[in-house]
Amino acid sequence: METTEASMNNITDISETLLIPLYCRARETQSKNPLINDRKAVEITEKLNSVFATSTSPLHRRLAKGKLRRSANKKFTVFLAIRTRKFDRYCQEFLSRTPNGVIVELGCGLSSRFSRIDNGAVEWYDLDLPEVIAIRKQFFQETARSHMIASSVFDFQWMEQIAKTKNTILFIAEGLLMYLCEDDVKSPVLEIQHRFPGCDLVCEVENMFVINVLKKERWRKKFQQDYHLGPDVTMHFGIRDGKDFEHWGQGIRFLDEWTIFDDHEKKLGWMNLFACSKRLRKAQWIVHYQLQSL
């Protein structure tokens, strides 16, 4: 595992956030009445724990001890598991309509979604930065229908590999866009629309009020401390309404949206009360668009 430890030292603070959902999926899988079943996440975290236990990184050491954040640890795990489950369902619904469709996971990290929703026909692309894909290749192998692309989402050359397909495409972005600025979100979305008209985009978004709170140093530092994150990690991009992307240009059509509290999941417990507050209910949520031709 020395190779993995060296690779982890080469990624940015923001890329390192991929470890948090990974550990949440593993922890939830091993819980009573799990909401998701991600044995691959369990396998990976068990291998990482032996390295992280003696790491110089506070985040690594905390993860090895099963401490994902400073407070509401179990609820946070459930929160991310519900989010993961919903993205899985979006993919499954897409494949029920187009069984031989193409799914592109932007900022994939160490996601094992392909193994959970593979219907035997889907063409799958996992895209992330080269240093992240280098780590990913230590745990995953490419197959005839599952591919890895080592690229920044801003380097549009990666789209040329996807462009070879003639099938319908779904792009998903879980835990990615909020760490970018608006122009860095808008630019690839418009390019995807231009190159792949008719595709779907499902992405997680942050509410603008959360972004404004994190602009204050006190709250930004608290956010970083709660999750044991590096000083460069903060959120930049947010929206106020699910239809905000439609203002970026013609052909972007809002289809639907979903919040964590829409499932009324019992394992959330007292956090379900947040559904009573419009602001808290949509502090972070998922939006679904179709990117039509211009």
Residue ranges, per PLM feature:
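Rossmann-like AdoMet
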Residues: 1-104, 108-149, 162-165
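Conserved SAM/SAH-binding loop
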Residues: 151-156
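A short SAM/SAH-binding and catalytic strip from SAM-dependent methyltransferases
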Residues: 168-184
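A short, conserved alpha-helix within the catalytic core of class I
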Residues: 179-195
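Conserved beta-strand signature within the Rossmann-like core of class I S-adenosyl-L-methionine
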Residues: 192-209
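Short, glycine-/aromatic-enriched active-site segment of Class I SAM-dependent methyltransferases
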Residues: 215-232
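Short alpha-helix
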Residues: 232-259, 282
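Core SAM-dependent methyltransferase catalytic element
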Residues: 258-260, 267-294
